Every structure is written in C-alpha cells, then in structure tokens.
Amino acid sequence: MPNASRVALITGGAKGIGRGIGLELAAQGWAVAFCYRTSGDSAGETAAAIRTKGATALAIPADVSRPDDCERLVATVAAELGGIDALINCAGPYRRVSLLDETVAGWQEMFDNNLHPVFYLARLVAPRMIERKWGRIISFSMANADQGVAQPQITAHYIAKSGILILSRTLARLLAPHHITVNVISPGFVSSGSAPEEELQKMLKNIPAGYIGQVDDAVSVVKFLLSDEARYVNGANVHLSGGWGL
C-alpha cells in the first residue's frame, strides 16, 4: 500500500515528539490525524504545518483517558479519512512525587493517561487494521521500564509505562497473523519541550553518547517501524536513550 493511501492517528500530536512524527509522515505522503487535550493553539499550528507539506491534517480535541472520547476520536478519523493504518501513542503526562506522598487521585491519573489509552485505542483500531490486512501500533514507554527497578519518585508513572510493554507484547502476539506489528519505543532524555532544559543538562553526565536526544531521533525510529522494511519487527522494545541506564 503506498503511503499516499495510509492514515496515521497520533495521540499527543500537537507538540514535541508527536508533532515531529506528524510532520515527517506528512512529508512521506501520509494523511495525519492527531488529538490534543489542552494545546489548541499548538494543534492549529501543527495542522497548518502538515498541510504546507501537501498532506491532509485532522486535529481533534479529545481526552484519551476517557473511553467515550477514544470511541469518538477513532470514529471521526475513520469517517473523515477512510480508516486508520497506524496508531502512534505519544500522549502521557509525567509527574514526580514520592510514593509515600502519592494520592489515590494522582495514582489513578498516571494510569488513566499513560496506560489505559493504549488499551482503549488498540481495541478500537485493531478490527479496522485486521480488515485492511495491515497495520502498525507504536507506543512510547520510558527507558528502563523493562528492568523492574525501584522508582520511589515516579512510581505510578513507571508502573504505568511498564504496563505498556506487557500490553504491547500481548497485542503483538495476537495481531501478527493479520500483518499488524505492535512495538514500543522507550526514550530516555529527549529534548522535546516536556522537561526543562536545565534538568536535561544535569543528566548529561549519565548518558554515554554524550548528548541529549532530539525529537528527530525518535522520529527516525518511528519512521522505520512504520515501514514495510520493519514487517518482521514485532513485539520489540526499542531503547532510545543514548546508552543511559547501561
């Protein structure tokens, strides 16, 4: 299937890594739909930038922590663009708080916004991908989420991101017979606007590569995983950390 016939849905696509992915896919001829919750101005700017590349852009306000919003989101994209060939889960807030100071509401928020949307959306797009006999699902976790180490300051976030790995491997197993791959990208420190630059620079000494990752580094991995050249890559967890954590 040529890229001009393909449709991508990106959560958290108004800014940062999600925006970078959308712009790259637009340059490749994909139709790009993305959702946003509060970044209305950024969403408008991103949609306009996608259209300058000659691609179709569809920006949809949605709260992917809500199952009904996910249903509306998928239905809208399918109706407007004819289907969904790739789901790219970029949305997911990050919050630092000691586990001993965590609240029930704060704990629930991390799962509602990081893990649950991956399930909500996968169950909605999978039947459409099965029907088209092709599909890609890519989700963002976090570096060392597969190592099960103690994380006293980001416990809820870490466990939610770890859950994405298990969920994605299960989906990969179930969907493989239908020419659908499901993979995870686990970034370390990437300069995407979601974390203060001074905080990133403090971590530089722990990165063997000697520099902070950029949005384009993440985009390159997504670009490969979406390609037909990556058809045999399934259930993988790609570490995008410059060697951090080794």
Residue ranges and their predicted role:
Residues 14-16:
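Conserved glycine-rich cofactor-binding loop
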Residues 28-45:
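Conserved glycine-rich Rossmann-like NAD(P)H-binding loop of the short-chain dehydrogenase/reductase
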Residues 98-99, 106-111, 203:
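Substrate-binding pocket helix/loop in short-chain dehydrogenase/reductase
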Residues 127, 173-174, 231:
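Alpha-helical segment proximal to the catalytic Tyr-Lys
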Residues 138-163, 168-177, 189:
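Catalytic loop of short-chain dehydrogenase/reductase
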Residues 176, 181, 233-235:
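Short, small/polar-rich loop/turn modules that mediate ligand/substrate recognition or access, typified
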Residues 214-240, 245:
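C-terminal substrate-recognition "lid" of short-chain dehydrogenase/reductases
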